[in-house]
Curated annotation (Swiss-Prot):
Entry domain remark: The C-terminal RNA-binding region of CA is sufficient for all its nucleocapsid-like chaperone activities.
Transmembrane segments: none
Protein name: Transposon Ty2-DR3 Gag polyprotein
Lineage: Eukaryota, Fungi, Dikarya, Ascomycota, Saccharomycotina
Disordered, as annotated region: 1-89, 364-404, 416-438
GO biological process: viral translational frameshifting
Length: 438
């Protein structure tokens, strides 16, 4: 009769048990709380099972121990099956509410279904409490302050959080995954999870906790349907369906590769060459860009490469545009050979220019010096020195009347060497190819 009453009214069990224990005679060596498991209600038996399991089974976790983390216990769930994001749940809305983790400020608004996770991260028992570590994404209510100082004093939060976290859009196609993952990473950073996201070098500042891993897993599946994921993402999730961090790490690496591809295309489209650098250096630069694009499955044809190079030629290399304008079968190696030939010719001409200028200056040796003295003048000219002492009028008469003498004298002057003649104040007339007075 007593057992039937207990089953009919399980909520009054603790009071009845206490009364029966105190009313009956209990030996002194018996624990008054040692009640048979059959007399306990169902939820007490479940809690006893959980406590015994926690005491006997050591916890395993892939996350290092820290003062925020509570290692969950292994789950007795079946191994993952092949398929789309398996059938067991990772964090239900009720558990998210129990863990004090707000999903866009309202954990009950989680649009994702039940997902499966690794036994190292999930305890399937419904009464297993999740660790409470991260506060809700919404900013906690500030400390009460006086209404007078409400506008003057603003409490400073230790961790910057946002009231409204904009969720990423849902992935619509496999080709848009690289764009979608940028919004998803931004969403995680706005959710105070930026320190567990890999940087450009693939490094993270700290290991994520169980609750953080559950949150990332749920949100990733909620906005990225499995059938729209790229092949390389599916391959990672087929090995470890909860390894979202590896997906993010490789996504960041691919972003860097895509940025390099964009830089290479910009550099190739803006090529310029005027001969200021060596032709070998220019060829190596262009070949390196083309090879890097080829490694990323982007093939640049010889015709396209030649057109981009010809567009940036200037100076003595500009005439190659007309030479290759009518060619249909352009070879990049041939264009580099033409550029190298012009560069070598210009280099040889630049080396010969100083010697030619020096030889020209030797023949152009015309100078005049005037000493400080007022009685004498020194002149240096390319004509033959004459010892004529005739008067000025006689010299002028001879030059004007004798054309033969003029022609012979001109030939003789051109073959003469440099000489100096000292003229006095009275005799300052000198002979030249044409009559000229100094």
């Amino acid at each position: 009769m007593e057992s039937q009453q207990l089953h009919q009214n399980p909520h009054s069990l603790h009071g009845s048990a206490a009364a029966s224990v105190t009313s009956k005679e209990v030996p002194s060596n018996q624990d008054p709380l040692a009640v048979s498991a059959s007399n306990l209600p169902e939820f007490d038996r479940d809690s006893t099972k959980v406590n015994s399991q926690q005491e006997t089974t050591p916890g395993t976790s892939a996350v290092p121990e820290n003062h925020h983390h509570v290692s969950p216990q292994p789950a007795s769930v079946p191994p993952p099956q092949n398929g789309q994001y398996q059938q067991h749940g990772m964090m239900t809305p009720n558990k998210a509410m129990a863990s004090n983790w707000a999903h866009y400020q309202q954990p009950s608004m989680m649009t994702c279904s039940h997902y499966q996770t690794s036994p190292a991260y999930y305890q399937p028992d419904p009464h297993y409490p999740l660790p409470q570590y991260i506060p809700p994404l919404s900013t906690s209510s500030p400390d009460p302050i006086d209404s007078q100082n409400q506008h003057s004093e603003v409490p400073q939060a230790k961790t910057k959080v946002r009231n409204n976290v904009l969720p990423p859009h849902t992935l619509t196609s496999e080709e848009n995954f690289s764009t979608w993952v940028k919004f998803y990473i931004r969403f995680l950073k706005n959710s105070n999870l930026g320190d567990i996201i890999p940087n450009d070098q693939g490094e993270i500042k700290r290991q994520m906790t169980y609750e953080e891993h559950a949150y990332i897993y749920n949100t990733f599946q909620a906005f990225a349907p499995f059938h729209l994921l790229p092949t390389w993402v599916k391959q990672i999730l087929e090995i470890n369906y909860a390894d979202i961090l590896t997906v993010l790490c490789k996504s960041v690496s691919k972003m860097q590769t895509n940025n390099q591809e964009l830089k290479d295309w910009i550099a190739l489209a803006n090529l310029e060459y005027d001969g200021s650098t060596s032709a070998d250096t220019f060829e190596i630069t262009v070949s390196t860009i083309i090879q890097r694009l080829k490694e990323n499955n982007i093939n640049v044809s010889d015709r396209l490469a030649c057109q981009l190079i010809l567009k940036g030629l200037s100076g003595d290399f500009k005439y190659l545009r007309n030479q290759y304008r009518t060619k249909t079968n352009m070879k990049l190696s041939q264009l580099f050979a033409e550029i190298q030939l012009i560069y070598d010719e210009n280099k040889i001409m630049n080396l010969n220019k100083p010697s030619q200028y020096k030889q020209h200056s030797e023949y152009k040796n015309v100078s005049r010096t005037s000493p400080n003295t007022t009685n004498t003048k020194v002149t240096s000219r390319n004509y033959h020195r004459t010892n004529s002492s005739k008067p000025r009028a006689a010299k002028a008469h001879n030059i004007a009347t004798s054309s033969k003498f003029s022609r012979v004298n001109n030939d003789h002057i051109n073959e003469s060497t440099v000489s100096s003649q000292y003229l006095s104040d009275d005799n300052e007339l000198s002979l030249r190819p044409a009559t000229e007075r100094i």
